[in-house]
């Protein structure tokens, strides 16, 4: 969390929108909980809320930490640094061209309304359930332990180049 907070501060100092690649957001929250001082007693949801509070926008494939069979997200903070940086304003400060509206028009003409993004109701409900499940500490702990078990097994079997400790979604060799 410290690196996210400090990176956001630097980006904002130079008026650069701070964007997160949030494909593994829940996994990152788990490692923050386990490794950073002051987070041990916080829930994954509380950590996620803080983590996303520092960004001006994020992208994520929701097939990963969303447990969905499809879907992704591109999100921007309303009237945040991204909006200020890429919208055009008149001399009096009123809005001339709103980048949010431009993106919404592109979204609707390409993928469907921004409230569903061409996803079926079933897929949206599966995604909602998956996002909820990813906030379960026991699930995340089991996932990390499975990766460590596999990585340590490879290492003990003499596989060269196993990266230890393993992450939370795969084993690197």
List PLM regions with ranges.
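Conserved PLP-binding catalytic core of the aspartate aminotransferase-like
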Residues: 160-173
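Conserved PLP-enzyme active-site core in the AAT-like
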Residues: 1-162
């Amino acid at each position: 969390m410290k690196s996210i907070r400090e990176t956001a501060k630097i980006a904002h100092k130079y008026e650069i929108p701070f964007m997160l690649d949030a494909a593994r957001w829940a996994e990152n929250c788990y490692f923050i909980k386990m490794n950073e001082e002051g987070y041990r007693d916080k829930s994954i949801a509380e950590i996620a809320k803080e983590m996303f509070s520092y960004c001006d926008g994020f992208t994520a494939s929701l097939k990963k930490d969303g447990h969905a069979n499809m879907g992704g997200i591109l999100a921007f903070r309303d009237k945040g640094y991204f909006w200020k940086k890429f919208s055009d304003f008149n001399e009096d400060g009123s809005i001339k061209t709103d980048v949010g509206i431009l993106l919404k028009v592109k979204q609707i003409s390409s993928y469907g309304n921004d409230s569903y993004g061409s996803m079926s109701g079933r897929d949206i409900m599966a995604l909602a359930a998956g996002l909820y499940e990813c906030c379960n500490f026991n699930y995340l702990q089991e996932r990390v332990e499975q990766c460590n078990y596999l990585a340590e097994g490879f290492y003990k079997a003499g596989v060269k180049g196993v990266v230890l400790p393993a992450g939370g979604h795969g084993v690197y060799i």
